[in-house]
Protein backbone atom coordinates (compact mmCIF):
# COMPACT_ATOMS: atom_id res chain seq x y z
CA UNK A 1 0.00 0.00 0.00
CA UNK A 2 1.02 3.61 -0.15
CA UNK A 3 1.04 6.69 2.01
CA UNK A 4 -0.35 9.96 0.73
CA UNK A 5 2.87 11.88 0.05
CA UNK A 6 4.88 8.92 -1.16
CA UNK A 7 2.22 7.98 -3.67
CA UNK A 8 2.50 11.36 -5.40
CA UNK A 9 6.24 10.97 -5.95
CA UNK A 10 6.42 7.48 -7.41
CA UNK A 11 4.80 5.71 -10.30
CA UNK A 12 1.57 4.01 -9.24
CA UNK A 13 0.98 0.48 -10.45
CA UNK A 14 -2.25 0.08 -12.47
CA UNK A 15 -3.78 -2.19 -9.85
CA UNK A 16 -3.10 0.46 -7.17
CA UNK A 17 -4.77 3.36 -8.98
CA UNK A 18 -8.37 2.59 -7.89
CA UNK A 19 -7.23 2.29 -4.28
CA UNK A 20 -5.27 5.53 -4.56
CA UNK A 21 -8.39 7.24 -5.88
CA UNK A 22 -10.38 6.01 -2.88
CA UNK A 23 -7.57 7.16 -0.60
CA UNK A 24 -7.49 10.68 -2.05
CA UNK A 25 -11.27 11.18 -1.90
CA UNK A 26 -11.35 9.94 1.68
CA UNK A 27 -8.45 12.26 2.55
CA UNK A 28 -10.64 15.22 1.47
CA UNK A 29 -13.20 14.21 4.16
CA UNK A 30 -15.87 13.59 1.53
CA UNK A 31 -16.88 10.40 3.28
CA UNK A 32 -20.04 9.68 1.28
CA UNK A 33 -18.30 10.06 -2.07
CA UNK A 34 -15.38 7.99 -0.82
CA UNK A 35 -17.76 5.25 0.30
CA UNK A 36 -19.60 5.25 -3.04
CA UNK A 37 -16.38 5.02 -5.06
CA UNK A 38 -14.95 2.36 -2.75
CA UNK A 39 -18.12 0.28 -2.95
CA UNK A 40 -18.08 0.45 -6.75
CA UNK A 41 -14.43 -0.59 -6.90
CA UNK A 42 -15.09 -3.39 -4.43
CA UNK A 43 -17.85 -4.77 -6.64
CA UNK A 44 -15.88 -4.43 -9.86
CA UNK A 45 -12.49 -5.57 -8.62
CA UNK A 46 -11.46 -9.20 -8.51
CA UNK A 47 -8.65 -8.56 -6.03
CA UNK A 48 -7.68 -6.28 -3.14
CA UNK A 49 -11.07 -6.70 -1.45
CA UNK A 50 -9.51 -6.56 2.01
CA UNK A 51 -8.02 -3.14 1.33
CA UNK A 52 -11.29 -1.73 0.02
CA UNK A 53 -13.02 -3.04 3.14
CA UNK A 54 -10.59 -1.07 5.32
CA UNK A 55 -11.55 2.16 3.58
CA UNK A 56 -15.24 1.31 3.78
CA UNK A 57 -15.02 0.75 7.53
CA UNK A 58 -13.66 4.27 8.07
CA UNK A 59 -16.27 5.81 5.76
CA UNK A 60 -19.20 4.01 7.39
CA UNK A 61 -18.17 4.90 10.94
CA UNK A 62 -17.53 8.58 10.25
CA UNK A 63 -20.68 9.00 8.14
CA UNK A 64 -22.70 7.55 11.01
CA UNK A 65 -20.94 9.83 13.50
CA UNK A 66 -21.81 12.91 11.43
CA UNK A 67 -25.47 12.03 10.75
CA UNK A 68 -27.84 12.21 13.71
CA UNK A 69 -30.99 10.19 14.17
CA UNK A 70 -34.24 12.18 13.76
CA UNK A 71 -34.52 12.61 17.54
CA UNK A 72 -31.04 14.17 17.69
CA UNK A 73 -29.21 11.22 19.25
CA UNK A 74 -25.99 9.83 17.85
CA UNK A 75 -26.33 6.82 15.56
CA UNK A 76 -24.32 4.54 17.82
CA UNK A 77 -25.30 1.37 15.97
CA UNK A 78 -24.15 2.95 12.72
CA UNK A 79 -20.87 3.86 14.40
CA UNK A 80 -20.21 0.16 15.02
CA UNK A 81 -21.51 -0.66 11.50
CA UNK A 82 -24.80 -2.27 12.50
CA UNK A 83 -27.87 -1.43 10.42
CA UNK A 84 -30.39 -1.43 13.28
CA UNK A 85 -30.73 -2.15 17.01
CA UNK A 86 -29.92 -5.67 18.07
CA UNK A 87 -27.43 -7.88 19.82
CA UNK A 88 -23.88 -6.58 19.57
CA UNK A 89 -22.03 -9.69 18.45
CA UNK A 90 -18.42 -9.98 19.56
CA UNK A 91 -17.32 -11.56 16.30
CA UNK A 92 -18.58 -8.47 14.44
CA UNK A 93 -16.73 -6.18 16.85
CA UNK A 94 -13.57 -8.22 16.30
CA UNK A 95 -13.98 -7.95 12.53
CA UNK A 96 -14.28 -4.17 12.72
CA UNK A 97 -11.29 -3.87 15.05
CA UNK A 98 -9.20 -5.80 12.56
CA UNK A 99 -10.37 -3.58 9.68
CA UNK A 100 -9.44 -0.51 11.71
CA UNK A 101 -5.93 -1.86 12.19
CA UNK A 102 -6.09 -3.09 15.78
CA UNK A 103 -5.20 -6.69 14.94
CA UNK A 104 -2.41 -8.24 12.91
CA UNK A 105 -3.13 -6.10 9.85
CA UNK A 106 -2.68 -2.36 9.36
CA UNK A 107 -5.06 0.22 7.93
CA UNK A 108 -3.22 2.93 5.98
CA UNK A 109 -6.30 4.99 5.05
CA UNK A 110 -6.80 8.54 6.39
CA UNK A 111 -8.82 9.16 9.57
CA UNK A 112 -8.25 5.67 10.90
CA UNK A 113 -7.65 7.06 14.41
CA UNK A 114 -10.73 9.28 14.35
CA UNK A 115 -12.89 6.37 13.19
CA UNK A 116 -11.41 4.17 15.93
CA UNK A 117 -12.29 6.72 18.61
CA UNK A 118 -15.88 7.01 17.39
CA UNK A 119 -16.14 3.23 17.20
CA UNK A 120 -14.82 2.72 20.74
CA UNK A 121 -17.10 5.45 22.11
CA UNK A 122 -20.25 3.87 20.62
CA UNK A 123 -19.12 0.39 21.65
CA UNK A 124 -18.45 1.52 25.21
CA UNK A 125 -22.04 2.74 25.54
CA UNK A 126 -23.80 -0.10 23.74
CA UNK A 127 -21.81 -2.69 25.70
CA UNK A 128 -23.39 -1.38 28.91
CA UNK A 129 -26.71 -3.33 29.14
CA UNK A 130 -28.54 -0.64 31.13
CA UNK A 131 -27.61 2.22 28.84
CA UNK A 132 -28.13 0.11 25.71
CA UNK A 133 -31.68 -0.66 26.86
CA UNK A 134 -32.43 3.04 27.38
CA UNK A 135 -30.92 3.91 24.01
CA UNK A 136 -32.93 1.20 22.24
CA UNK A 137 -36.08 2.50 23.91
CA UNK A 138 -35.34 6.09 22.91
CA UNK A 139 -34.80 5.10 19.27
CA UNK A 140 -37.57 2.50 19.01
CA UNK A 141 -39.95 4.64 16.95
CA UNK A 142 -40.00 3.50 13.31
CA UNK A 143 -39.24 7.06 12.20
CA UNK A 144 -36.00 6.93 14.17
CA UNK A 145 -35.00 3.68 12.51
CA UNK A 146 -35.20 4.99 8.94
CA UNK A 147 -31.79 4.84 7.24
CA UNK A 148 -29.92 8.15 7.30
CA UNK A 149 -27.30 7.17 4.75
CA UNK A 150 -25.47 5.04 7.31
CA UNK A 151 -26.48 1.55 6.17
CA UNK A 152 -23.62 -0.83 5.56
CA UNK A 153 -24.74 -3.56 3.20
CA UNK A 154 -21.79 -5.78 4.10
CA UNK A 155 -22.62 -6.29 7.78
CA UNK A 156 -24.98 -9.11 8.74
CA UNK A 157 -27.05 -8.58 11.86
CA UNK A 158 -28.89 -11.30 13.74
CA UNK A 159 -32.50 -10.29 13.04
CA UNK A 160 -33.82 -12.57 15.77
CA UNK A 161 -32.15 -10.38 18.37
CA UNK A 162 -33.68 -7.06 17.27
CA UNK A 163 -35.40 -5.28 20.12
CA UNK A 164 -37.29 -2.14 20.97
CA UNK A 165 -40.02 -2.15 18.31
CA UNK A 166 -43.62 -1.15 18.94
CA UNK A 167 -42.87 1.14 21.88
CA UNK A 168 -44.02 4.28 20.08
CA UNK A 169 -42.42 7.68 19.90
CA UNK A 170 -40.87 8.95 23.12
CA UNK A 171 -39.01 12.07 24.12
CA UNK A 172 -35.62 11.52 25.71
CA UNK A 173 -36.61 13.69 28.67
CA UNK A 174 -39.48 11.30 29.45
CA UNK A 175 -37.23 8.31 29.98
CA UNK A 176 -36.23 7.05 33.43
CA UNK A 177 -32.55 7.90 33.84
CA UNK A 178 -32.72 9.99 30.67
CA UNK A 179 -29.73 12.05 31.80
CA UNK A 180 -27.53 9.15 30.68
CA UNK A 181 -28.80 9.55 27.13
CA UNK A 182 -26.92 12.83 26.96
CA UNK A 183 -23.95 10.57 26.31
CA UNK A 184 -25.50 9.80 22.92
CA UNK A 185 -26.19 13.43 22.11
CA UNK A 186 -22.76 14.99 22.65
CA UNK A 187 -21.68 16.82 19.52
CA UNK A 188 -18.00 15.96 19.75
CA UNK A 189 -17.71 13.04 22.17
CA UNK A 190 -14.06 12.27 21.35
CA UNK A 191 -11.26 12.95 21.78
CA UNK A 192 -11.19 14.64 25.20
CA UNK A 193 -7.88 16.40 25.68
CA UNK A 194 -8.36 17.26 29.34
CA UNK A 195 -7.28 14.82 32.02
CA UNK A 196 -9.28 13.99 35.10
CA UNK A 197 -12.98 13.30 35.40
CA UNK A 198 -14.90 14.02 32.20
CA UNK A 199 -18.66 14.35 31.52
CA UNK A 200 -18.65 10.95 29.83
CA UNK A 201 -17.69 9.25 33.08
CA UNK A 202 -21.05 9.67 34.81
CA UNK A 203 -21.47 5.94 34.57
CA UNK A 204 -18.95 3.12 34.91
CA UNK A 205 -18.06 0.20 32.74
CA UNK A 206 -19.17 -3.18 33.99
CA UNK A 207 -17.18 -6.35 33.60
CA UNK A 208 -19.55 -8.13 31.25
CA UNK A 209 -17.12 -9.69 28.80
CA UNK A 210 -16.62 -6.85 26.37
CA UNK A 211 -14.50 -7.90 23.44
CA UNK A 212 -14.17 -10.57 20.78
CA UNK A 213 -14.51 -14.21 21.68
CA UNK A 214 -12.34 -15.78 19.00
CA UNK A 215 -8.80 -15.48 17.61
CA UNK A 216 -6.95 -12.51 19.13
CA UNK A 217 -8.06 -11.01 22.42
CA UNK A 218 -8.65 -7.27 22.59
CA UNK A 219 -7.83 -6.19 26.14
CA UNK A 220 -8.98 -2.69 27.06
CA UNK A 221 -7.45 -1.40 30.30
CA UNK A 222 -8.40 1.92 31.86
CA UNK A 223 -5.44 3.73 33.36
CA UNK A 224 -6.94 6.03 36.02
CA UNK A 225 -3.50 7.31 37.07
CA UNK A 226 -2.50 10.47 35.26
CA UNK A 227 1.26 10.66 34.92
CA UNK A 228 2.84 7.32 35.72
CA UNK A 229 4.36 5.19 33.01
CA UNK A 230 2.29 2.53 31.23
CA UNK A 231 3.88 -0.79 30.42
CA UNK A 232 3.37 -0.88 26.66
CA UNK A 233 4.00 -3.96 24.56
CA UNK A 234 4.73 -3.81 20.85
CA UNK A 235 1.07 -4.56 20.13
CA UNK A 236 -0.32 -1.92 22.49
CA UNK A 237 -1.54 1.58 21.79
CA UNK A 238 -2.32 4.33 24.30
CA UNK A 239 -5.29 6.58 23.54
CA UNK A 240 -7.59 9.08 25.23
CA UNK A 241 -11.00 7.42 24.93
CA UNK A 242 -14.14 8.37 26.82
CA UNK A 243 -12.14 10.91 28.81
CA UNK A 244 -9.56 8.47 30.17
CA UNK A 245 -6.13 7.18 29.27
CA UNK A 246 -6.74 3.77 27.72
CA UNK A 247 -4.22 1.09 26.82
CA UNK A 248 -5.52 -1.25 24.11
CA UNK A 249 -3.58 -4.45 23.58
CA UNK A 250 -4.03 -7.16 20.98
CA UNK A 251 -3.01 -10.48 22.49
CA UNK A 252 -2.72 -13.86 20.84
CA UNK A 253 -5.58 -16.06 21.99
CA UNK A 254 -4.54 -19.02 24.12
CA UNK A 255 -6.00 -22.51 23.98
CA UNK A 256 -8.44 -21.78 26.77
CA UNK A 257 -12.10 -21.12 27.36
CA UNK A 258 -11.42 -17.78 29.05
CA UNK A 259 -13.45 -14.88 27.68
CA UNK A 260 -11.77 -11.49 27.22
CA UNK A 261 -13.13 -8.72 29.35
CA UNK A 262 -12.93 -4.99 29.78
CA UNK A 263 -11.57 -4.00 33.17
CA UNK A 264 -11.30 -0.66 34.89
Swiss-Prot record:
<dbReference type="InterPro" id="IPR053052">
    <property type="entry name" value="Imprinting_Balance_Reg"/>
</dbReference>
<comment type="function">
    <text>Product of a dosage-sensitive gene that contributes to the maintenance of paternally and maternally imprinted gene expression in the endosperm in order to balance parental contributions. Underlies postzygotic reproductive isolation by promoting triploid seed arrest in a genetic dosage-dependent manner, thus being a component of postzygotic interploidy hybridization barriers.</text>
</comment>
<dbReference type="GO" id="GO:0009960">
    <property type="term" value="P:endosperm development"/>
</dbReference>
<dbReference type="GO" id="GO:0005634">
    <property type="term" value="C:nucleus"/>
</dbReference>
<protein>
    <recommendedName>
        <fullName>Protein ADMETOS</fullName>
    </recommendedName>
</protein>
Amino acid sequence: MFSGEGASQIRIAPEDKPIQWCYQILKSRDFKSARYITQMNLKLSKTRHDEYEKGLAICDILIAAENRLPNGLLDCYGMIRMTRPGLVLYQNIEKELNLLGWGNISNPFPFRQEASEKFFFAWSLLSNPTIKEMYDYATSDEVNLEPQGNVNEYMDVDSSSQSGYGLGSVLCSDLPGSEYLKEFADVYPLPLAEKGQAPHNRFGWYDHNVGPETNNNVVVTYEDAKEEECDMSSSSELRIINGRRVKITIEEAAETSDTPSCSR
